[in-house]
Amino acid sequence: MATEQTPLLKVNNIEVIYEHVILVLKGVSLNVYEGQIASLLGANGAGKSTTLKAISNLVKAERGEVTKGTVEFDGIRVDRLFAPQLVKMGLIQIMEGRHTFEHLTVEDDLLTGAYTRGRDKKGTKAALEMVYGYFPRLRERRSAKTGYISGGEMQMCAIGRGLMAKPKIMLLDEPSMGLAPLLVEEIFNIIRRLNKEEHVGMLLAEQNAAMALKYAEYGYVMENGRVVLDGDAATLADNADVKEFYLGLTAVGKKSYRDVKHYHRRKRWLA
């Protein structure tokens, strides 16, 4: 059982190998505490998605394997469990790419997330109303096929489906990807509300570092399959390397293509 002192999610020095030969994660460690929003920052290919899949054990579906280290959730070692077992424990991953069941209506898509509730019709109905409370747009679109709704509505549907399973923690992979700035702000505001009001922990894998650090309490910067920097969000947002390489800022403010440098200051963690 997690407490304020012990993490709800503890990733300890994990290594992930694909196809028995491709080393993707190299000693990744991180903690997420109960009710915390933490973020994984990094460029495409840094290892963020693989880290989430290693935690949720979806990496096995892609011929990957956690070959070293451990993953603990709510005080239990889970890296040898199957993904459905983790869902029943309250660890839910929202995949990159806004996956929905295109042939189902929005409401039926949401209800697929309630399978762990079994025959608890009352609880399922209450959960559905809770989801509609956070995403009123989904209530309006409840009868529409998910294959014909907007990208923002698909993302809302994917998060809502995860909420139906009574999560203790949600792993969100690139929730801002492909969305207009106003929709990104709306999605992140709802993520914050879910965290505060429903006490759902969040681990966000996000290339949009500015948005992630705005809403997260703690962050981890990944590069080439390793965590190279971590700290509370405010400290990371003020870090010179994070500013230049992930926020697009320099000592004189935002970068302009007119003033683009023909060199980069070497990252301190590569020195």
PLM features: what roles do these ranges have?
Residues 2-271:
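Glycine-rich phosphate-binding loops of nucleotide-dependent enzymes
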